[in-house]
Amino acid sequence: MRSTLKSLITAVALAGAASAQAATVHIYNWSEYIGENTLEAFEKETGIQPVYDVFDSNETLEGKLLAGRSGYDVVVPTNHFLGKQIRAGAFQKLDKSKLSNWDNLDPALLKQLERNDPGNAYGVPYLWGTNGIGYNVEKVKAALGVDKIDSWAMVFEPENIKKLSSCGVAFLDSADEMIPAMLNYLGLDPNSENPADYRKAEAKLMEVRPYVRYFHSSKYISDLANGNICVAAGYSGDVFQAAARAEEAGKGIEIAYSIPKEGGNLWFDMLAIPADSGNVEQAHAFINYLLRPEVIAAVSDYVGYANPNLKAGELMDQEVRQDPSVYPPQDVLDRLYVSAELPPKIQRLMTRSWTKVKSGQ
């Protein structure tokens, strides 16, 4: 009996040790949006194993969050989705006593973010960037006879995009990104609450639809880098990554990024802990790790997106830190718009319009 009891105690102890060693944090992030060694280094330092999945649209993430059983411990929503998700009870409050690196964040940015998250109670800024146009310099010159793209007219006017269609044009697969871009191009409010404005944007998108090869929010990275397409309406850092891959391949493909003269979207992505998280301690540990200047500096260097950490800039590769496509100068920032949270009826209208545009019917 003593032997059996002793064996039982040993088995329980071993199970406990194994459980402690098997601490995990389940992360749901945008594709191509973490440093090359970030997850590996975090696990090596903390013993917490990251279980990592990716998505490529806010709508996909929101569907999981609002279903109530996300299965994740850390997620990365864009800021203008955050307010609605907070009100829906999708997240739990941060325990800032577990975020010792919080003070590294830019207080001016934190103040701006309080619009959707009063007191910064639920969200931690991760990275920020812009939307614009990535393009193959040589192929665009051959198709259009121009050295650079400086206007949304290159993809939003049929006579231009038709010429580019032979070498391939991709659009982001997101109503939330592409419809406001068209509204802004048409001189309308990108955060309009007027249904008539959305009908105009839809009509214009339908004009160029025949010349769009595909809609996807990450595939264009490799396709630009490989020369499979020549133009993509996309995210700044994704185009940065495409350019870096093209350069590494050494095949003479030059990829450039433009924030068109009409302006574009400036956005902020946040780190948040879902209400159903089963590993809250580990979630805080991972977020706190990303708040370390040297960690987020390495992330920015790799993915080509700006970060809100005041101490990270000096630790970054200065070619990246001084790149105007990553950290735009003030005159460019002045012509950017920040997406607002829109009423549900407008969101539904955008979704219906986008379905029509993608189907071409």
Write out the residue ranges for each language-model feature.
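Conserved C-terminal helix/tail region of periplasmic/extracytoplasmic solute-binding proteins
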Residues: 222, 330-361
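A ligand-binding cleft/hinge motif common to bilobed small-molecule-binding domains
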Residues: 81-84, 231-252
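Short beta-strand->loop
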Residues: 92-103, 153, 249-265, 274-276
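Gram-negative bacterial Sec-dependent N-terminal signal peptides
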Residues: 1-21
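Mature extracytoplasmic/periplasmic domains
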Residues: 269, 274-335
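Extracytoplasmic ligand-binding site segments that recognize negatively charged/polar headgroups
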Residues: 76, 82, 86-211, 221-225
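Periplasmic-binding protein-like
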Residues: 198-207, 213, 251-272
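Early extracytoplasmic/lumenal segment of secretory-pathway proteins
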Residues: 22-85
